Structures are given as structure tokens and as C-alpha cells.
């Protein structure tokens, strides 16, 4: 099969999926959200690294991990991490706020990727510096895909929160915590069943707050780009035994909360 030179020229003019994603970022998203502030990227930065699979097995639950390379000290720490997916209908995935009590500003979530795109993480330090890492993911159709049959269980258990420490609890050191909230996280862009013309409005978890012994660990502002049953991994530093409280809200003014006792000797299960 021969391809005309006109088609090849048009494709070259349009650019590769990576080029188009970069254009969407530079022309729109970067200026809208960070104006003319300098963002340090590539080999010039050694603050964070975003990891995601190059090819999504399931575009509705793409795992994204952000690894940070500096300690959270009172003098210098990552204050916010912004996550964007350039080619999603709503590019912002979420904004995550941290404190020195986080120990590390690492974060892991599962996201919906609607079309092949770069996923970007921008770390904003308390000093005002901005650093970016990105990873390209091949995917399509996540935001407009009907939810899986398991959504019924999410609706039935709406707002139920499970928490666990990953590994042994170590006082005075960063400990990895996992939180999962049952919620359908509807995008407002897809019918509940394939072939249906009825599209329910967006309905998703929009805030997530974690407090340990009355100290803020992480607060998140989220969009429907977060997958069904939002799962969040993060760090915290327990100086002593105490209580972790997780609170979430959704776009229907729902509010959900759960507590978990942290002790050095307690088996680590919710």
C-alpha cells in the first residue's frame, strides 16, 4: 500500500503524539497555571521523578508514582506537587500539599488517561522553585469509557476508607501509608452502560486530607482523572504512637472520615 506524500507531509506537520502533547503544555497549560515562572526540567533537575507505564494495559487505572529526592526539612521542602495529563479533557489530575511532617513528598495514585499523552508532575518548593518530571503514556478512551460492573460495589460501600502502613512502623522515620476510598468517581463524560445515551453528571472525590496527631501530612485537591476507588500512597513521620485521620469530600457534598491507630508493635493491617 502506497501512502501519498501529501499524507506524510500532513502527519509531519501535525507532529508526533509526544510533540502534540508538548505543544498542549507549552501553549496552554504552562501559561495558564504557572505564567512566566521558570520550571527546571530534564537533567537540570534532581528533585523528583515521575514513573508510569509507557503502554497502559487499562487506561482507566494507570499507576503513577512520583519519587522525590530531597528530604522534607523546615528550611527546604516540597510544598506542592501538581499532576497534569496534557491531552485529558480536564488536564489537571490533582494538587497535593505537603509539610515537613510528611518526611518525604512521594505520592502514588491511579489515573485515567484519555489519549496518548505526557503525564507531568511539577514540584513547588517552599522557596518558590519549580521542578518538573514527565513520562509519556500510550492510552485512549479512559474518560469516556463506561465504568466497570464493579462500580456497583463502590456505590454500595460509598465513602468506606481502608488504611494500612506498608511494612513495619518505624518511629522518627518516613513510613509509607496507603489509603483507599470506595467511590465510583464518575467523569460525567460516559454512560453507565455501553450503548446508553444517558450520561450521568460528574461525581467524584474532590478533596482528601490526612492528619496525624493533629499535624497535617498531606492534603489533595482532585479531579475525575483519578480512577474509581481513589487510592493514595504517601509518607509520614510518626514521632510517637497516635491516631491518623483521613477525611474526604466529593462533588455531591458528601463527607467521609476514618481513623487508624499507629503503634510500633501493632500488626500493619486495616
Can you annotate each of these PLM segments?
Residues 16-20, 140-162, 265-270:
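Low-complexity, Pro/Ser/Thr- and charge-rich linker/hinge segments at domain boundaries
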Residues 80-84, 207-211, 247:
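Beta-strand signatures of extracellular beta-sandwich domains
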Residues 114-118, 174, 239-243:
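Extracellular Ig-like/FN3 beta-sandwich strand-entry sites
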Residues 125-133, 249-259:
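Short acidic/polar inter-strand loop motif in beta-rich domains
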Amino acid at each position: 500500500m502506497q501512502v501519498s506524500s501529501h499524507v506524510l507531509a500532513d502527519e509531519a506537520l501535525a507532529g508526533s503524539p509526544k510533540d502534540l502533547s508538548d505543544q498542549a503544555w507549552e501553549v496552554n497549560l504552562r501559561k495558564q497555571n504557572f505564567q512566566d515562572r521558570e520550571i527546571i526540567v530534564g537533567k537540570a533537575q534532581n528533585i523528583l521523578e515521575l514513573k508510569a507505564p509507557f503502554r497502559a494495559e487499562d487506561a482507566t487505572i494507570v499507576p503513577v508514582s512520583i519519587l522525590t529526592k530531597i528530604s522534607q526539612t523546615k528550611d527546604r521542602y516540597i510544598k506542592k506537587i501538581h499532576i497534569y495529563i496534557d491531552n485529558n479533557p480536564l488536564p489537571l489530575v490533582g494538587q497535593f500539599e505537603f509539610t515537613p511532617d510528611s518526611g518525604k513528598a512521594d505520592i502514588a495514585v491511579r489515573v485515567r488517561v484519555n489519549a496518548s499523552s505526557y503525564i507531568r508532575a511539577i514540584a513547588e518548593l517552599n522557596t518558590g522553585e519549580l521542578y518538573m518530571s514527565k513520562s509519556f503514556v500510550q492510552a485512549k478512551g479512559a474518560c469516556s469509557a463506561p465504568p466497570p460492573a464493579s462500580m456497583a460495589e463502590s456505590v454500595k460501600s460509598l465513602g468506606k476508607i481502608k488504611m494500612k502502613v506498608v511494612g513495619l512502623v518505624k518511629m522518627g522515620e518516613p513510613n509509607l501509608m496507603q489509603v483507599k476510598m470506595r467511590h465510583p468517581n464518575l467523569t460525567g463524560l460516559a454512560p453507565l452502560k455501553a450503548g446508553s445515551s444517558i450520561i450521568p453528571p460528574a461525581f467524584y472525590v474532590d478533596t482528601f486530607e490526612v492528619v496525624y496527631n493533629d499535624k497535617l501530612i498531606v492534603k489533595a485537591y482532585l479531579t475525575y482523572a483519578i480512577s474509581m476507588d481513589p487510592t493514595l500512597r504517601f509518607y509520614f513521620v510518626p514521632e510517637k504512637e497516635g491516631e491518623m485521620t483521613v477525611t474526604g469530600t466529593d462533588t455531591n457534598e458528601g463527607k467521609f472520615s476514618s481513623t487508624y491507630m499507629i503503634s510500633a508493635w501493632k500488626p500493619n493491617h486495616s
